[in-house]
Swiss-Prot record:
Gene name linked to the record: aroC
Pfam families: Chorismate_synt (PF01264)
Natural source organism: Rhodopseudomonas palustris (strain BisA53)
Keywords annotated in UniProt: Amino-acid biosynthesis, Aromatic amino acid biosynthesis, FAD, Flavoprotein, FMN, Lyase, NADP
Cofactor requirement: FMNH2
Name listed for the protein in its UniProt record: Chorismate synthase
Species lineage: Bacteria, Pseudomonadati, Pseudomonadota, Alphaproteobacteria, Hyphomicrobiales
EC number: 4.2.3.5
Amino acid sequence: MSFNTFGHMFRVTTFGESHGVAIGCVVDGCPPLIPLTEADIQGDLDRRRPGQSRFTTQRQEADQVKILSGVMAHPVSGEQVTTGTPIALQIENTDQRSKDYSEIKDKYRPGHADFTYEAKYGIRDYRGGGRSSARETASRVAAGAVARKVVPGMTIRAALVQMGPHAIDRAKWDWAEISNNPFFCPDKDKAAFFEEYLDGIRKTGSSIGAVIEVIAEGVPAGLGAPIYGKLDSDLAAALMSINAVKGVEIGDGFATAALSGEENADEIRSSNHGPVFLSNHAGGILGGISTGQPVVARFAVKPTSSILSPRKTIDREGHDTDILTKGRHDPCVGIRAVPVAEAMVACVLADHLIRHRGQVG
C-alpha cells in the first residue's frame, strides 16, 4: 500500500491500523532548533481523543504520544529542540475489541471502505477498518502539532458549523465557546440544541453528518504557487483525505456560483499597513496564492456508516446477505474531525511556508 505520505518539503508519513499495536507518523523536513516536547503534542491529541463524551465512540484510548527521534537537549540551554532529522511519533493502541468485528470478516459494510480495499489489494483488515479507520487521524493530529511549531505566527482554528440540516447562527459566533461544549461549536445556543438533537439520533443507533469550517489567521501574502502548486488545491486535497469527507469549498465556495461579478469581487483599498480587502469571498487565496487575509475552508462530513439498523450487502463470495454492524462508533464523526482539520491545514501551511522561503528567500 502506497500513498501514506503527503507534503513536499514538510512531509508526513502515517502508519498503523485501528487494531494494531500502535499508530504513528514520521515528520520529515521540520527545521532544526524548534522547541518540541511531548506536552506540545499531547494537548492537540487530547482534543481529538475518543470516549470524552457520549457523543463520540466509547473506545477508551489515552493517546499518549512518544517522541522516538528527531529531538535532543540543546547543548547550551538544555531545552529539547528539533534536530532537523525525521521526527518519529508513536501512539499505542490499548482498547481494541476485535471480536466486535467477527461478523464482518466475510461481509462488506455498506458505506465503508471494506469492498474497495479488498477489490484493490485482495485483502483487508476487517478489525475496526484497519487503515481506513478514523483512528488513523490521531497520527495526523500529532503531525499537525509539530506543524504549528513551524508556523507560530499563524492561528489555525476550526469549528463545527452545521449538524445535519441545522446550521449555527453566525451572528452568535464566539471562539471562546468552542471549548465549552463537546461539539466544538462556536454558537452557545446551537450547541445546546445539538446536545438534544444528537442524543435522539444516538439512542436510535443512527448517525448524522456535519459541516466543519477552518480559519487560518496570520497567513502572510505569497504562500502557494500558480497552476499545480496552488495553496487552495493542496488544502482541498488535505481536507478531502480525512475520513468521511465528501466535499470541500474555499471561501464562499459553491455560493459564489449564485453571485454576480460585482458581488463576488474582493475590492481593495490602501492603508498605512498595506492593502486592505473590503471582503473575503475568495477565502484568502487568489490565483492559488495567499492574499494575507484569513484563509477559510469548509468541508462536509458524511454520516457515520456504522449504524445499528440491518442493511443489505454481499459477502466475499458475491452472495446477497444482510449485515448488522456492531462495535463502538461515533454518531457524528464530524465532531472529532475538527482537530484533525486544524492539523491538516497546519501541515499544508507549514509545507508552503518552507517551500516559499526556499523559492524566494
